[in-house]
Amino acid sequence: MADYLISGGTSYVPDDGLTAQQLFNCGDGLTYNDFLILPGYIDFTADQVDLTSALTKKITLKTPLVSSPMDTVTEAGMAIAMALTGGIGFIHHNCTPEFQANEVRKVKKYEQGFITDPVVLSPRDRVRDVFEAKARHGFCGIPITDTGRMGSHLVGIISSRDIDFLKEEEHDRLLGEIMTKREDLVVAPAGITLKEANEILQRSKKGKLPIVNENDELVAIIARTDLKKNRDYPLASKDAKKQLLCGAAIGTHEDDKYRLDLLSQAGVDVVVLDSSQGNSIFQINMIKYIKEKYPSIQVIGGNVVTAAQAKNLIDAGVDALRVGMGSGSICITQEVLACGRPQATAVYKVSEYARRFGVPVIADGGIQNVGHIAKALALGASTVMMGSLLAATTEAPGEYFFSDGIRLKKYRGMGSLDAMDKHLSSQNRYFSEADKIKVAQGVSGAVQDKGSIHKFVPYLIAGIQHSCQDIGAKSLTQVRAMMYSGELKFEKRTSSAQVEGGVHSLHSYEKRLF
């Protein structure tokens, strides 16, 4: 910090605060509320802060935010919203393998560059087939080829405008009678770049642009809606095919290999091995199996809270580590099993070890506010996984209900008896599938409505950027570098200091965050 002194009157600056090493090597287990980060020098605006972070060895996100694979947090709607806002969502596995794979497929199909496997119909199909496709896939701009398959002669396209006002008795009409014919279509030649194709699509004012080869056979299609999504969501997390990134959770049992096969077919980018205690022979064997059979899929191991746990998973070949045990708002593992670790200490200790091997860390659990996110990232985590913070958003699974005039959504731990009763996957996560008596490691509850992810996540992003600005770092990479070098200083908080740091001495107040 002394490098940034601008007053010329004195050069003496007393040593102030503790380094991360001093703070966490005292033997105490610390949570995020037990310390603060001391401010630095500001010479830039908050919007200049770069939040780019590594999720795994090969996947980088523009924002360090991840949604937890819980059945009251992440299904396709949440995963799409998280990816559009720069993060990623992990589809839970407290469901059938087919349902989970279909949720992944929804995310991957939501936005694409060149769509090489679109829904295709033939002129002999009927209007009702279009409505069925629309109900199943959410769209009805469907190319028509002579055989109803990709790679055959393009003869037309069917859009919502062609069928909007058809009466129910007309649903048996052949598509060849009502489709927009080939001679009225705007098409682009195979080999065109995505940028050039998008320019043609813009000029044409059409909803879809078929891509055809020299024989007028359909080879791909691009959609106008994807152009609008590119404009509206510049931070979106995408793969090489311009599809949204999507993760999914799996277990470590033999039948999870079938689940993995379906997820791979659906296009999943990364899987997290979902276990409350990841340092097991079952997880080590599963990591090796995935890396051998599906080397392109990134694997996140966990959960771990010590360097010794992390070592075994790193040696097995994980691409990232998930850190946290018993720190979640609905988790009672520490209380029931007497195992776990305060989250701030766990994040620092595992991150400090894993960085030597280039393995990113995901801080999972204990996040109550945007300040906790900033602290987790400052302690070495590359990304932060959130459950309760994202529960009860519009995109979270479940229906809203009212209690005492407050709009709520259900939220439960995957170790709760409620979740274990729903599907075997929750029992597997806690090694309880063979137990006659279940030991709950989580609870069920309710969380107040937070509105849409598209408003809430931008608030979190702005909060992290302002935190980095106060620290004096223009990127999260710089924050971590300052922490490991000892330049970033911390200070422990007494219980009185924590009270002082919150709202106090008011008769009444309204706490609006965004």
Swiss-Prot record:
Activity: how regulated: Mycophenolic acid (MPA) is a non-competitive inhibitor that prevents formation of the closed enzyme conformation by binding to the same site as the amobile flap. In contrast, mizoribine monophosphate (MZP) is a competitive inhibitor that induces the closed conformation. MPA is a potent inhibitor of mammalian IMPDHs but a poor inhibitor of the bacterial enzymes. MZP is a more potent inhibitor of bacterial IMPDH.
Residues the record lists as binding IMP: S329, D364, G365, G366, G387, S388, Y411, R412, G413, M414, G415, Q441
Record-listed Phosphoserine modification sites: S122, S160, S416
Keywords: Acetylation, CBS domain, Cytoplasm, DNA-binding, GMP biosynthesis, Isopeptide bond, Metal-binding, NAD, Nucleus, Oxidoreductase, Phosphoprotein, Potassium, Purine biosynthesis, Repeat, RNA-binding, Ubl conjugation
Highest taxon of source: Eukaryota
Cofactors required: K(+)
Cross-link position per record: Glycyl lysine isopeptide (Lys-Gly) (interchain with G-Cter in SUMO2): K195, K208, K438
Residues where NAD(+) binds: D274, S275, S276, G324, M325, G326
Keyword Mitochondrion on entry: no
GO CC aspect terms: cytoplasm; cytosol; nucleus
Catalytic reactions on record: IMP + NAD(+) + H2O = XMP + NADH + H(+)
Enzyme Commission number(s) of this protein: 1.1.1.205
One record GO biological process: GTP biosynthetic process
Signal peptide: none
Annotated Gene3D superfamilies: Aldolase class I (3.20.20.70)
Alphabetical list of CDD domains matching this protein: CBS_pair_IMPDH, IMPDH
Major localization listed first in the record, in broad terms: cytoplasm
Subcellular location: Cytoplasm; Nucleus; Cytoplasm, Cytosol
Record GO terms (molecular function): DNA binding; IMP dehydrogenase activity; metal ion binding; nucleotide binding; RNA binding
Similarity-based family: Belongs to the IMPDH/GMPR family.
Biological function: Catalyzes the conversion of inosine 5'-phosphate (IMP) to xanthosine 5'-phosphate (XMP), the first committed and rate-limiting step in the de novo synthesis of guanine nucleotides, and therefore plays an important role in the regulation of cell growth. Could also have a single-stranded nucleic acid-binding activity and could play a role in RNA and/or DNA metabolism. It may also have a role in the development of malignancy and the growth progression of some tumors.
Protein name: Inosine-5'-monophosphate dehydrogenase 2
The organism of origin for this protein: Bos taurus
